[in-house]
Amino acid sequence: MKQSLGLLEVSGLALAISCADVMAKAASITLVGLEKTNGSGWMVIKIIGDVASVQAAISTGVSFADQRDGLVAHKVISRPGDGILSHSVTPESESEPAPAPTPVVPHEEIPEDHAAPEAPQDAELISCNLCLDPACPRQKGEPRSLCLHSGKRGEA
């Protein structure tokens, strides 16, 4: 099946991302990319797919951008020439190299004698986030007047 190319030009990055999201949800298309144009903060959204899907996605994106007063231009090229489609779509093999395999290192068990030291058990929990005093009865979220050190702020 022949791929078609859809272009939607909107003003602003946030609107471009929102339009791309709406178009991807509306039809079975592939988002080729978002490209910043020169001046005025315009962005071009490039999509590919079969003709009906691209037309449906572009019409959805046009109505979405028009409601938000950000539509600049739109175009669906049903049967683009070989040079246009190959020039606007970069192959994935060039853009994303295959990840290098990671070596598998066997996990050795650490004897209990050499285990990492645990936190001391006698450490008291700090409940007041104002004075950080473990003896303070105030809990986080309670009024500041319940803090033991409520009148002593700013003193060293």
Curated annotation (Swiss-Prot):
Cofactor note as given: Might bind an [Fe-S] cluster in vivo.
Biased composition (Basic and acidic residues): 106-116
GO cellular component, one term: bacterial microcompartment
Descriptive protein name: Bacterial microcompartment shell protein PduK
Localization: Bacterial microcompartment
Function in brief: A minor shell protein of the bacterial microcompartment (BMC) dedicated to 1,2-propanediol (1,2-PD) degradation.
Cofactor: Fe cation
Keywords: Bacterial microcompartment, Iron
Biotechnology: Artificial BMCs can be made in E.coli by expressing pduA-pduB/B'-pduJ-pduK-pduN-pduU-pduT (in this order); pduT and pduU are optional, while pduA, pduB/B', pduJ, pduK and pduN are essential. A construct with the reversed gene order does not make BMCs. Ethanogenic BMCs can be made in E.coli by targeting pyruvate decarboxylase (pdc) and alcohol dehydrogenase (adh) to them. PduP(1-18)-Pdc and PduD(1-18)-Adh strains targeted to the BMC (PduA, PduB, PduJ, PduK, PduN, PduU) make significantly more ethanol than strains where Pdc and Adh are not targeted to the BMC.
Associated pathway: Polyol metabolism; 1,2-propanediol degradation
PROSITE patterns in UniProt: BMC_2 (PS51930)
InterPro entries named among the record's database cross-references: BMC_dom (IPR000249), BMC_shell (IPR050575), CcmK-like_sf (IPR037233), CcmK/CsoS1_BMC (IPR044872)
Organism (species): Citrobacter freundii
Pfam entry (one): BMC
Family: Belongs to the bacterial microcompartments protein family.
All residue ranges annotated as the BMC domain in the record: 4-89
Assembly with partners or alone: Interacts with shell protein PduA and assembly protein PduM. Interacts with PduP, probably with its first 18 residues.
Signal peptide from the UniProt entry: none
GO biological process, one term: propanediol catabolic process
CDD domains xrefs: BMC_PduK
